[in-house]
Swiss-Prot record:
Key words, A-Z: ATP-binding, Fatty acid metabolism, Ligase, Lipid metabolism, Magnesium, Metal-binding, Mitochondrion, Nucleotide-binding, Transit peptide
Extent of the transit peptide: 1-22
Domain of life (superkingdom): Eukaryota
Reaction(s) catalysed by this chain's protein: a medium-chain fatty acid + ATP + CoA = a medium-chain fatty acyl-CoA + AMP + diphosphate; hexanoate + ATP + CoA = hexanoyl-CoA + AMP + diphosphate; octanoate + ATP + CoA = octanoyl-CoA + AMP + diphosphate; decanoate + ATP + CoA = decanoyl-CoA + AMP + diphosphate
Gene3D superfamilies for the chain: 3.30.300.30, N-terminal domain of ligase-like
Tissue note: Detected in adult olfactory epithelium.
Organism listed in the record: Rattus norvegicus
Lineage summary: Eukaryota, Metazoa, Chordata, Craniata, Vertebrata
Family stated for the protein in its record: Belongs to the ATP-dependent AMP-binding enzyme family.
Annotated compartments: Mitochondrion
Broad enzyme group: ligase
Tagged with keyword ATP-binding: yes
Function statement: Catalyzes the activation of fatty acids by CoA to produce an acyl-CoA, the first step in fatty acid metabolism. Capable of activating medium-chain fatty acids with a preference for C6-12 fatty acids.
Record protein name field: Acyl-coenzyme A synthetase ACSM4, mitochondrial
Chain sites annotated for binding ATP: 229-237, 368-373, 455, 470, 566
Length: 580
C-alpha cells in the first residue's frame, strides 16, 4: 500500500506503508507512555523517567492508537497555503516520513547525536519533519525565522557552533555570504524543489531514504532544542531545553490552558522561529493527540485569516494580541466560525478592551497566558475560572508564582514588584537547562530561592496576576512608578488609537515623563494634531490616575516590533534618550 502526499505546488512524496515501532527495544527503559503519567510528573506526583524521547514515547504511541482506531480520524498535521495546496499527515505518515528524514540527517549529512542543527524555514511541512527527525536522532534543534538578516544568521551560527543548517531558498544567499566565517558549519541542507550550488537537496535525499530507523534512546535531561531569546535588551541568549522540559513539561498546558482533546484542530499562528510554535504547534497539541493546523501566510492578512477560520473546522485558535486588535476592528458578526470554541493569546499583554470587544462580537472568551522562553507558561486564564479583564490569570502547576522586592522578599497583594517563581530544593525539570556558554546570565536568573522573570507585576487577593511591564520599561516620573501597559490600555479605549507604545522621555524637572507613540485609525489621520493630543491626554487622565497621562505625544505610521510582533519599547526609549 502506498500513500500519496501532496506537498506544495506540484511536489509529491511517495512512501510505503508506515513501518512498525522503531524505538526503545527494552520495555523497562521506556518512559511512561500515558498522558496521565506525563501530567502526574508535572504535578510532582511521579519522578521524571531516566529516559524520554518525544518522537518515540508520544508521537509513535499516537500512531499506534490511530492504527487501532483509538484516535479520531483527524490528521496529525494539516497544512494549507491559500493557493489550493494542502498536506494532511496522520501520525503514522508523520512517523514514516520523519524516520526517512532522520536517515537524511545522519547519513548524507553526517550528523551525530548532540550536534546542533540550525533550522530556518517558513511554515512548511518540512519544518515539522526536521523537528521530529532531530528528536529521533538526538540532534539539537535550533529554529529561526526566515526574517533573520545576514548578521542575525552569522551570530547564531557562530554562537551555537552549529554543524548543519537547514534552510529555504529565501535564506540560502544570506547563508552562503557568511558560511566561510562559520568554521563549525559542515553541511547545508536546502528545502526547495530547485538545486542550489553547495547545498544538499532535502527533497531528493528524502525520496531515496530508508524508512527503517531506530530512535535514539535520549536521556530525559539530554539537550533537545536551543531557542534564541528575542534580544530586546541585548544580543539574543541561547536558552537550551531538555527532552523532558519541552516533551513532558507542556502536558498540563495542553489540558488546562489550550483545553485540547484528540478531536480538536489547533491553529497557532506563531512563527516557526519562536518557542510559542513549540508550545502550540508541537508539544502541547501532540501530547493531547490533537491536530496541528498550519496556514502559510507570508504576511498577516485580515481577510485571509477570517476566510480560513470560516472555511476550516478549526476548534482552537491562538494568536498574538496584535492580531486580535486588528480583528475587532472588523464586523465579526458577519462571519460564522463553525467549530471555533476556544481562543487564546499571549506574547504580550492583552488590553481589556480587546477582550471585551472580541467576546461581544463572537460570543467567545479570550484566554490570555503569560510565559517565557526559559520556563514556558507561568500563569494563564483557564476554562471554568473567572476571567478578570486585564489580568494574565493565575499561576499554573507546577509553579509557585510570587511578587517580590529587590531583596527577594514576598510582597503583599496589591503591591507592585518583580514576577518570580519560588523554587524548592531541586530545579524544576520544565525549566530551561542553561543559557549556553553564558553561566553568568544563567546564574543571574536566580535570586535567593526565586527565579526572576525580569517582568514587573501585581497580584490581587485571589491570586490573579497583572502585568506592569518589563523591569526596564517602567517609568519613574517625579517619584511615581508608571507601567506602560496601563497607559497603553487607556489610550486604546479611544477610537482614534489603533496602537500605541509608551516609554520614558527625559525631562529637566521630573527626570523623566511619559511619552506615547500613537498609530492613528484612518478616520483620525487628518485631525488637528494639537487638539487630538489634548483630547487623548484628557482621556487618559479620566481613565486612570492623572499622573500617568502622556505629557508627550508623537503620532507615527507604525511601531517598531520584534519578529514575533512584540513592541520594541527599548528602541523608542533609546531614541528618546539619544542612545539610538
Amino acid at each position: 500500500m502506498k500513500v500519496l502526499l501532496r506537498c506544495q505546488r506540484l511536489r509529491f512524496i511517495w512512501l510505503a506503508k508506515p513501518a512498525g515501532r522503531h524505538f526503545h527495544r527494552d520495555p523497562q527503559l521506556w518512559a511512561p507512555l500515558t498522558l496521565d503519567d506525563f501530567e502526574a510528573i508535572n504535578r510532582c506526583e511521579k519522578p521524571l523517567p531516566k529516559n524520554f524521547n518525544f518522537a518515540a514515547d508520544v508521537l509513535d504511541q499516537w500512531s499506534l492508537k490511530e492504527k487501532s482506531g483509538e484516535r479520531p480520524a483527524n490528521p496529525a498535521l494539516w497544512w494549507v497555503n491559500g493557493k489550493g495546496d494542502e498536506v494532511k499527515w496522520s501520525f503514522q505518515e508523520l512517523g514514516s516520513l520523519s524516520r526517512k528524514a532522520a536517515n537524511v540527517l545522519t547519513k548524507p549529512c553526517g550528523l551525530q547525536r548532540g550536534d546542533r542543527v540550525a533550522v530556518i524555514l517558513p511554515r512548511i511541512p518540512e519544518w515539522w519533519l526536521i523537528n521530529v527527525a532531530c528528536m529521533r536522532t538526538g540532534l539539537v534543534f535550533m529554529p529561526g525565522t526566515i526574517q533573520l538578516t545576514r548578521k542575525d544568521i552569522l551570530y547564531r551560527l557562530q554562537a551555537s557552533k552549529a554543524k548543519c543548517i537547514v534552510a529555504s531558498e529565501e535564506v540560502a544567499p544570506a547563508v552562503d555570504s557568511i558560511a566561510s566565517e562559520c568554521p563549525n558549519l559542515k553541511t547545508k541542507l536546502l528545502v526547495s524543489p530547485h538545486r542550489w550550488d553547495g547545498w544538499l537537496s532535502f527533497q531528493e535525499l528524502l525520496q531515496s531514504a530508508s524508512e527503517e530507523h531506530n530512535c535514539v534512546q535520549t536521556g530525559s535531561q539530554e539537550p533537545m532544542a536551543i531557542y534564541f531569546t528575542s534580544g530586546t535588551t541585548g544580543s539574543p541568549k541561547m536558552a537550551q531545553h531538555s527532552q523532558s522540559s519541552l516533551g513532558i513539561g507542556y502536558a498540563l498546558c495542553g489540558r488546562y490552558w489550550l483545553d485540547l482533546t484528540s478531536s480538536d484542530i489547533m491553529w497557532n499562528m506563531s512563527d516557526t522561529g519562536w518557542i510559542k510554535a513549540a508550545i502550540g504547534s508541537v508539544f502541547s497539541t501532540w501530547l493531547r493527540g490533537a491536530c496541528v493546523f498550519v496556514h502559510r501566510m507570508a504576511q498577516f492578512n485580515t481577510d485571509t485569516f477570517l476566510d480560513t477560520l470560516t472555511s476550516y473546522p478549526i476548534t482552537t485558535l491562538c494568536s498574538a494580541p496584535t492580531v486580535y486588535r486588528m480583528l475587532v476592528q472588523q464586523d465579526l458578526k458577519r462571519y460564522q466560525f463553525k467549530r471555533l470554541r476556544h481562543c487564546l493569546t499571549g506574547g504580550e499583554p492583552l488590553n481589556p478592551e480587546v477582550l471585551e470587544q472580541w467576546k461581544a462580537q463572537t460570543g467567545l472568551e479570550l484566554y490570555e497566558g503569560y510565559g517565557q522562553t526559559e520556563v514556558g507558561i507561568i500563569c494563564a486564564n483557564r476554562k471554568g475560572e473567572e476571567i478578570k479583564p486585564g489580568s494574565m490569570g493565575k499561576g499554573v502547576v507546577p509553579y509557585d508564582v510570587q511578587i517580590i522586592d529587590e531583596h527577594g522578599n514576598i510582597l503583599p497583594s496589591g503591591k507592585e514588584g518583580e514576577i518570580a517563581l519560588r523554587l524548592g530544593s531541586d530545579r524544576p525539570f520544565c525549566f530551561f537547562s542553561e543559557y549556553v556558554d553564558n553561566p553568568e546570565k544563567t546564574d543571574a536568573t536566580i535570586r535567593r530561592n526565586f527565579y526572576i522573570t525580569g517582568d514587573r507585576g501585581v497580584m490581587d487577593d485571589d491570586g490573579y496576576l497583572w502585568f506592569v511591564g518589563r523591569a526596564d520599561d517602567v517609568i519613574i516620573s517625579s517619584g511615581y512608578r508608571i507601567g506602560p501597559f496601563e497607559v497603553e490600555s487607556a489610550l486604546i479605549e479611544h477610537p482614534a488609537v489603533v496602537e500605541s507604545a509608551v516609554v520614558s522621555s527625559p525631562d529637566p524637572i521630573r527626570g523623566e515623563v511619559v511619552k506615547a507613540f500613537i498609530v492613528l485609525a484612518a478616520p483620525f489621520k487628518s485631525s488637528n494634531r494639537e487638539k487630538l493630543t489634548a483630547e487623548l491626554q484628557d482621556h487618559v487622565k479620566n481613565s486612570t490616575a492623572p499622573y500617568k497621562y502622556p505629557r508627550k505625544v508623537e503620532f507615527v505610521q507604525e511601531l517598531p516590533k520584534t519578529i514575533t510582533g512584540k513592541i520594541k519599547r527599548n528602541v523608542l526609549r533609546d531614541q528618546e534618550w539619544g542612545r539610538a
